[in-house]
């Protein structure tokens, strides 16, 4: 199993989200647990961002993450509306 890292910029987004929409944050954290079990299950982004993977949250949001095999870690890179993230 992998362990979780969160970029500081994303952590501040999550703090704001905790105040605005706590249920959405709970969904994200549950999805992060699924990612940690099998991060290679999810789809890679296209070049030039093909070192990143993505997973949809609800219908309109995307969580982008990277995998570091050496340290067995998953880093949550970004989270935003589908139209803004790419």
UniProtKB/Swiss-Prot annotation:
SUPFAM superfamilies: RelE-like (SSF143011). Gene3D superfamilies: RelE-like. To M.jannaschii MJ1173. This is Uncharacterized protein MM_2549.
């Amino acid at each position: 199993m992998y362990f979780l890292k969160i970029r500081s910029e994303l952590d501040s987004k999550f703090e704001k989200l905790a105040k605005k929409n706590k249920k959405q944050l709970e969904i994200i954290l549950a999805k992060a647990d699924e990612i940690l079990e099998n991060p290679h299950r999810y789809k890679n982004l296209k070049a030039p961002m093909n070192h990143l993977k993505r997973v949809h949250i609800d219908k309109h949001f995307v969580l982008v993450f990277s995998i570091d095999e050496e340290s067995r870690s998953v880093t949550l890179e970004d989270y935003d509306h589908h139209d803004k993230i790419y």
